[in-house]
Design a protein with these regions (language model features):
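A catalytic-pocket lid/entrance helix-loop region that shapes and gates access to the active site
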Residues: 2-51
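Residue-level signal for short, function-critical loop segments
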Residues: 7, 133, 245, 272
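Alpha/beta-hydrolase fold active-site neighborhood
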Residues: 55-233
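Conserved alpha/beta-hydrolase "acid-adjacent" motif
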Residues: 248-253
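C-terminal soluble interaction/assembly domains
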Residues: 255-274
């Protein structure tokens, strides 16, 4: 049994979504950090915040309003010209005021264009999709700088309609599964975040997480099933469990809730991303193939793809 990026059963499902809020924010910052580290190649900025701003400007051009997801921490290189003397304390002030700044800019743009919705930006949707997939980060960066666009071919209206129907069905199915199997009460403290994201910002990095994290997603419906019992004690070959330190979907700090009852042998992938076997990480692939052939796990650590 190979458990790739195992979730915590104790968080199913409202808790999983709540944990993904910080997970996706950190994952987004890791993505921008990767691009900034390779500025000589991508020319999008030498700090994560500079890349974030270039990205935000493109989202705003597509949607009419800027994105509101949490910006990365500022560095000394982000200080405005003439304020370099402020050093790290100045950068820390920029970091502390960053969330309020992006919300204020969003509201200013929203007032000018009331019908503008940030989720209408194809780039924003693409970003949310690719944050957990480091193998696509290079292609994403080239798309962002315009050197190699990733835009899919335009579908005909009928194909687009069917795609939208399929997406709606998938969301309804997810809702049924989540609410039928949920074992974690909603957190009412997340209701303000949900209401703001649902009725004002339409921030895809917050909307779904707060929808279920707050409990609003199930609308008071009681679960039909409970937590499934897990016990790996009778398995002759114990599972191999692969967990990444920067996983936005199943955050690393919760992995023992699965590994302990399953008696898994955990391999920690030191890097970002969700699902690492057969995802272009040769070291992880070799570990997984060796395990599937022999049942042996000879290491506890592996490098991330990024």
């Amino acid at each position: 049994v190979l458990l790739d990026s195992g979730m915590s059963p104790k968080l199913a499902w409202n808790g999983i979504f709540a944990s993904q809020q910080r997970g996706y924010e950190k994952g987004l910052h890791d993505l921008f950090g990767f691009i900034a580290k390779n500025d000589a190649k991508y020319h999008l900025g030498s700090t994560p915040l500079q890349v974030y701003e270039k990205w935000s400007q493109k989202v705003a051009r597509e949607a009419g309003v800027r994105p509101t997801v949490l910006p990365p921490n500022a560095k000394i290189g982000d200080l405005p010209p003439g304020l370099e003397f402020a050093g790290q304390p100045g950068a820390d002030i920029m970091t502390a005021t960053g969330p309020l700044r992006v919300q204020a800019e969003f509201l200013s743009q929203k007032i000018q264009q009331p019908n503008a919705v940030q989720v209408s930006s194809p780039l924003l949707g693409m970003t949310r999709l690719l944050v957990p997939i480091p193998a696509q980060w290079d292609a994403f960066a080239k798309h962002l700088n315009g050197s190699e666009p990733m835009d899919a071919e335009q579908s005909d209206p009928e194909a687009l309609r069917k795609e939208q129907e399929s997406l709606a069905q998938a969301m309804n199915m997810q809702n049924l599964i989540v609410c039928n199997e949920n074992t974690v009460p909603g957190n009412p403290l997340l209701y303000p975040s949900y209401l703001w994201a649902n009725f004002v910002s339409a921030d895809p990095f917050t909307l779904i997480n707060s929808l279920y994290g707050s409990g609003a997603g199930c609308g008071g419906r009681a679960p039909v099933t409970g937590q499934a019992p897990l016990d790996g004690s009778k398995l002759a070959t114990k599972p191999l469990q692969i967990q990444a330190t920067g996983d936005p979907q199943t955050p690393y700090q919760y992995h023992t809730s699965l590994s302990k009852p399953m008696q898994s042998r955990v391999v920690t992938v030191h890097g970002p991303g969700h699902a690492h076997f057969a995802s272009q990480n040769k070291v992880v692939d070799d570990i997984g193939v060796h395990y599937l052939r022999t049942g042996e796990v000879t290491t506890t650590d592996a490098p991330g793809l990024i």
